[in-house]
Each structure stands twice: as structure tokens, then as C-alpha cells.
UniProtKB/Swiss-Prot annotation:
Protein's name in the database: UDP-3-O-acyl-N-acetylglucosamine deacetylase
EC number: 3.5.1.108
Function field: Catalyzes the hydrolysis of UDP-3-O-myristoyl-N-acetylglucosamine to form UDP-3-O-myristoylglucosamine and acetate, the committed step in lipid A biosynthesis.
Annotated Gene Ontology cellular component terms: membrane
Amino acid sequence: MKQTTIAKKVTSVGIGLHKGEPIRLTIEPSSENTGIIFYRSDLGISFKAEPKNVVNTQMATVIGNQKGYISTVEHILSAINGYGIDNIRINVDANEIPVMDGSSISFCMMLDEAGIKNLDASKKAIIIKREVEVKEGEKFVRVSPSKSPKFDYTIKFSNPIIGTQQFAFEFSRKNYVDEIARARTFGFLKDVQMLRSMNLALGGSLENAVVIDDNKILNPDGLRYENEFVRHKILDAIGDLSLLGAPILGDYTAYAASHDLNHKLTLAILTDAKNYEMVSIDEQIAHEYAKIFA
């Protein structure tokens, strides 16, 4: 199985969640073994999508260095991971990825327009060899060996609109588009009002998030899935784990987790070489993990 990139450059413009200003986003083909590269065209600096370049995980995943950063990378990374794309360059002219509609479906549409191109080098994957878990109180994230990789996530909120939700998702590109990609980010009206008082979330609206006010959803069209909230958490996790640089061949399980716990999990996996094996995907591995590469 070969590494992939996109076949052509595609550009879109969307609103930044925090500043509320238009952001120009361009995805471009990239050569084999380069991975996912973010480029700040306004600053002329770039960052590779990898755990060591994560600089903040409060409310979003932020990558960068001393010269600059890009916030809210998890949704576009989720789409790229969902589509199994190994090498791509992402250009933005601001310090955040546009929020689009709050899900990853707009990025999926950009990838569909760009098309997927095979490269010469062999595709790589990370086989999870033993269980790795990160816990903080009752919250946890965990990966474990599995021949049919899935994401199993449980959330628990005191708000009755969300409550306790659990969803298990068997990873494949088709399942990603059908079951995960349209799930939007969500928040509470009181939190949005607080953030705006801090000059943040200026681009947030009912057009790009599910907003909850006490016991009701403010969006006129309601939810896209009955359990859209937990599905979006899986969307985020798929994006956060893509920072490992290759698809994970193993199960991911989470309870009340966060971007921060996901980041700590990626670091924990890489800390000990006994936790995983980086492999080139030959016919045997492709057959063993047939569902993920369907």
C-alpha cells in the first residue's frame, strides 16, 4: 500500500472562531515522507503536525513554536486522518484554522475536490503492541491492541441536554464520512458570553456550533445526529491522534477526555518503544486490518 497526498491545490475562505475575521485556507499536494505541514503564509513560518509541536490544549489543539502558532487544528487533521492522507501542506494567513460549520465536513469536501494521489513510498502505520492509558481522576484515554480498530468514547455532562452519551465507531473512510464528519463542536451560551467578554469566540455562532442554553438547544434545525455531542468528541480525537504521523492500528477508548488528555496519550505512546511498532503496510498487514483501509 502506497503513501498518499492530494492531487491538486484547493482554496477556501472561512471565519476564524476566536477573532471572527475571514481566513484564507489552502491545501496543497506534498511529497512522500513529509507528513502534514502547516504554513503561516502571513508570517512565512511552518510547523510539522507532531506531538512535540503542540503548545496549547485548552479548548483546542494548538501547534507552533517561538515564532508563531496555529490554533484549532484538530478538525482539519481529523478529516485528513479520516481520509487516510499521509502528506499534505496546509496554508493559512492567520493564527487559526477557519471554523467552517464547526465539524470537519467542509474539509472533507475540500479533500474530495482535490482528489487523492498515490506516491511511490510505502504507507506507514502504528501498530499498538500493548495497552497505554492516561488518567486524571475518573477521566481517561487509552489505546490497546486490536485487529479491527475502533474509537469508543463516553461523555458525561450534568446538563440534561447532553447527559451521558456513548458511541463506538469502527474506523474506515466511509464510516468517518457517514458517522463522524458532520458532528459539530458545541458549547453553552453562558460560556460563549464569557469568552466574548475576553475578546474570544468572536466568530462563534449558530452557523458553526451547537449552542445550549440551560435545557434547550438554540440552533433552529436542532442536531444532525441524536448523539452529535459524543460523535464530535470522536472527531476531535481522530484529529488529535493524527499528530502521531501515521494511522493507529488499535482501539482508542475514552471517558470524559479532552484535547489535553489526547496529547498526553500521544506522548505516552511514543515514550516507550515497546508500546508500538511503526510498520510499512504490506499486503499481509492490509489484509489483517482490512476494514480500516477499505
